[in-house]
Swiss-Prot record:
GO biological processes: anterior/posterior pattern specification; DNA-templated transcription; embryonic skeletal system development; embryonic skeletal system morphogenesis
Identification of the protein by name: Homeobox protein Hox-C9
Organism: Mus musculus (Mouse)
Gene that this sequence comes from: Hoxc9
GO cellular component: aggresome; nucleoplasm; transcription repressor complex
Keyword Transcription regulation assigned: yes
SUPFAM superfamilies per record: Homeodomain-like (SSF46689)
Primary residence: nucleus
Length: 260
């Protein structure tokens, strides 16, 4: 049997064989959405006399709520079946994403959703920024649960508080030396002598004048000199004692020099 004219967009029942209809019906049972109508055998004795007919347009099977399918190249054929309905919060799984069970979690992702880690060569430029001096390596941020990363951070990252504590311990170890070592005692010994308070040039000059007039001062004169020079009586007394010892030494050296 044959039909004349173009057969595009037309269904010619005479070109289809109905011998295997019972076999196909047994393999693919009819569903509720598309019931298979039983075709009586008496209605199709010969279909050559019937003209070709066209079906009316059917309603759309897929609703408009389906998510957009990413555009693909028309050169390569990509067979795919019907996709399930996607929720509003679900993510598309692209070819450059790999699902990992222990990937790093991000705040923008839902808590119960699946996480995807980037491939190692996704950002080659950023790997050079993290050098060995930072204490962090690129794989540490790719794999591992959040708890493992928190436990791993104190081991790899140096803390300023830890460095300060180590420095204080080192100083304490230096201070705690052997007390029986005389060298250590001499190094850490502190002088108990009071800081020396030198006299000014004006005070020294006035004391020298007073010493030329009298090598020994009375109590009243010592009080008057201390009040004029803004000194204490003890300071004036000590200065005169030292000056007398110096004069005695100078006289002795002079006598020895004359005798020699």
């Amino acid at each position: 049997m044959s039909a004349t004219g173009p057969i595009s967009n037309y269904y010619v029942d005479s070109l289809i064989s109905h011998d295997n209809e019972d076999l196909l019906a047994s393999r693919f049972p009819a569903t509720g959405a598309h019931p298979a109508a039983a075709r009586p055998s008496g209605l199709v004795p010969d279909c050559s006399d019937f003209p070709s007919c066209s079906f009316a347009p059917k309603p759309a099977v897929f609703s408009t709520s389906w998510a957009p399918v990413p555009s693909q190249s028309s050169v390569v054929y990509h067979p795919y079946g019907p996709q399930p309905h996607l929720g509003a919060d679900t993510r598309y799984m692209r070819t450059w994403l790999e699902p990992l069970s222990g990937a790093v979690s991000f705040p923008s992702f839902p808590a119960g959703g699946r996480h995807y880690a980037l491939k190692p060569d996704a950002y080659p430029g950023r790997r050079a920024d993290c050098g060995p001096g930072d204490g962090r390596s690129y794989p540490d941020y790719m794999y591992g649960s959040p708890g493992e990363l928190r436990d791993r951070a104190p081991q790899t990252l140096p803390s300023p508080e830890a460095d300060a504590l180590a420095g204080s311990k080192h100083k304490e170890e230096k201070a705690d030396l052997d007390p029986s070592n005389p060298v250590a005692n001499w190094i850490h010994a502190r002088s108990t002598r009071k800081k020396r308070c030198p006299y000014t040039k004006y005070q020294t000059l006035e004391l020298e004048k007073e010493f030329l007039f009298n090598m020994y001062l009375t109590r009243d004169r010592r009080y008057e000199v201390a009040r004029v020079l803004n000194l204490t009586e003890r300071q004036v007394k000590i200065w005169f004692q030292n000056r007398r010892m110096k004069m005695k030494k100078m006289n002795k050296e002079k006598t020895d020099k004359e005798q020699s």
